[in-house]
Amino acid sequence: MAESSQGRGAVLAAWIGLILGPLLLLACILTDPPGGLSEKAWLTVGLAALMAVWWSTEAIPIPATSLLPILLIPLLDIDTLAKATAPYANPTIFLFLGGFLLGLAMQRWNLHKRIALATLLAVGNQPSRQIAGFMIATAFISMWVSNTATSIMMLPIGLSVIGLLIAGSEEKEGARFAVALLLGIAYSASVGGIATLIGTPPNALLAAFMRENYDVQIGFGQWMLLGLPLSVGMLIFIWWSLTRGGFRLAGGDSRGLLEKEMAALGPMSRAEKMVAVVFVLAAAAWIFQPLLADYID
């Protein structure tokens, strides 16, 4: 019943947004701009309001809303079609696209899961080490894959380990371990995104803003020189905060579970190996792009 009610609410919100968005744009078309604003700026406000309403209510698919400027900017005589379409070919967009495609390929062939399991098997069985392993694996994957996708991938592995490690522990200790591990996954997914330009969209947006407005070029490697140490430092601090204060569990051994999960993946397929090669080459190209720029140009 609750799900049905939520579904009806979403449909109602979409219908309201579908009507409200164009009305806001129409209001800007029919009214004079307030003091200090040009007519084109006022129409841009109306377009922004339309898009904000449609995005927030999902009146139409979100990607379709993102294409409205291509249609409405020249139609409303705000600017030319060439100016309206130029941002869609911004280098930052292609950086996002490359990162997303790489992340999808890793997820398609389970390369990210293999990396995570290998990391967890390497750190040992102590609870504090397991938390460190989860945080390292999550942060590393989040450097290249979206924070949300990384968290979703790591969560079932974490829950399985929690169930295994707390089986022979006291209830209070088990609960503390569970909370620390789940918080570690959540925090490290966000912290890992700081380390690279493609880790999270605001990073690349900042680089694009600095390039376009201040003529300051921030390369992939330059970002990592600052972002990676900051990310590592934050990971260490978070791990220390989560595991200090007598955090210990009496028993539990997750190695068997992790080895079973790794065995279930089987040997690396040809496609997975190719994705790994592309991943290494892409990461190297992003990092060393300033050194290669003279030869490419």
Regions found by a protein language model. Name each.
Residues 1-95, 212-214, 222-297:
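Hydrophobic transmembrane alpha-helices of multi-pass small-molecule transporters
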Residues 37-41, 59, 88, 106, ...:
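Alpha-helix capping and helix-loop boundary segments enriched in small/acidic/polar residues
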